From Swiss-Prot:
InterPro entries: Urease_beta-like (IPR002019), Urease_betasu_sf (IPR036461), Urease_subunit (IPR050069). This is Urease subunit beta. It comes from Burkholderia orbicola (strain MC0-3). Transmembrane segments: none annotated. Its main location: cytoplasm.
Amino acid sequence: MIPGEILTDDGEHELNAGRATLSLVVANTGDRPVQVGSHYHFFEVNDALSFDRAVARGFRLNIAAGTAVRFEPGQTRTVELVALAGERAVYGFQGKVMGPL
């Protein structure tokens, strides 16, 4: 075994089973690529990304931990978000929440 390695059974695994999800259309209005990591509070991503931020409050990308989604300049894509779990409090990032959701 390698330190940090995760061994799983064969087959497909559903991520975030039973958690609330939503789809959101996101456009990169900037002139540079924007990359968003798996656990970043989507409400607080780079301001060059245009979408309904109020809807995204309390959600993150519904992708595997440690991965990211890249938005090229001028690109529009639909992403799936999943509700944050645990204590549902957000601290840091851009400092737009700094407490319970």
